[in-house]
Amino acid sequence: MKIIIKTEKFWRYYFIVRILYLFFAIFVYAKLTTLGDTERYLTAPLSVISTSMLFNSTIMMDSIGSILGLLGGSNVITNLPATLLSYYTIKWAIDKFEFRKNVNNYLLFVILSLPNFCVWTGVFSKEMVGLVFSAILGTLFIDFLDGKYKIEKKHWFAMYLCMIFKPQYFPFILQGLVMVYLMNRYIKSVDWKMFLGCFVIFCNLACLYLISDIVNQYADIMYMYFDDPNAKSTRANPWTEENDFFYEAPAGMFIAFFGPTINEMMNSPTHMLAGIESIVILVLFLSLGFRLIIRCINSYKINVTIFFSYFVIITGIALLHYPFGIFNPGSAIRYRTNFFFLYILMFLYIKKYYKQFYLNKDKIIAKI
């Protein structure tokens, strides 16, 4: 009974936080900067509705937004469905795997209540949709890790949304799912699992090499989309020479995920707040992955299936986020929201997996 009361209290407080963030986004944040394309979606004319919305993310958002916008454009009422959808999606995913029983609830509450995450997923935006499909695909990935391979209608729908809104993420999520399926179901030898994992990584690197000329051409034109004279936070183009995209990738992937650099944090209060939030994220992720790190250091052992599937998904998505986040810290933080909850679920699973691993190990030792 205590657990039920505690659970209700946790989600009641979190619901209040999400509602407060909605009011903050509409009445404060929107006055300081723009809420992406939210206002445009919610003021679109009904004439934009067409069958093209099934294949184009922008037209889909315009079409749905034009209907919601009948209630007065962008306001608390028209953005409330986004807040509710985000809240119940997060609650469903966390409760599905009972993560609250294995993770410090205060830590979990903090990571789910981070400002930029709550603001961008609490208004009618593509980031809100990104949260939904990343949550559903994240739960499918964890189900695969647990040996449950049933793909339901909601998973197919999430794949569809991912292909419409962020098609570049899907190949790496699919690779992770296939690797887990093969390693868990058919490959029992650790050596062969290592071979498969290394082979998948090699194939990805080979593909990058084969399309390097196309990537270089893309890098040459990418900067112009961010080189807006009104964009005060746009950085200098780091890709001035051939293959700079690849040379700068290791540091660039981290910067694109983190957001503002130290110098930018020192020169802007808003960047300082965003930087502090990113520091909190890194600390929380390290905390969630602490047992995995300790196990690697102490025994040089690791779950090969988790390692390679996580590596492909996390680094693959980070690489694709890199060109969208390297030029502007604001864009980096906003676009990060699309896959942030997927990362949260993955790190929560690590925490749960190794907590249960050590608990079972202690029980065996106690019996001996």
Feature map (PLM): residue ranges:
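Short hydrophobic/aromatic helix or loop-helix immediately within or flanking a transmembrane segment
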Residues: 37-73, 251, 256
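Loop-to-helix entry region of an early transmembrane alpha helix in multi-pass inner-membrane enzymes
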Residues: 59, 71-88, 279
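Short acidic/glycine- and proline-prone juxtamembrane loop motifs at membrane-interface regions
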Residues: 122-129
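Specific aromatic-rich, kink-prone transmembrane helix
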Residues: 130-146, 342-346
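Transmembrane-helix signature of polytopic, membrane-embedded enzymes
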Residues: 93-115
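Transmembrane-helix motifs of polytopic, lipid-linked glycan transferases
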Residues: 80-100, 283-290
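Alpha-helical transmembrane segments and terminal signal-anchor/GPI-anchor hydrophobic tails
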Residues: 28-40, 163-299
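Membrane-interface helix-loop-helix junctions at transmembrane boundaries of multi-pass membrane enzymes
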Residues: 99-103, 147-152, 190-191, 266, ...
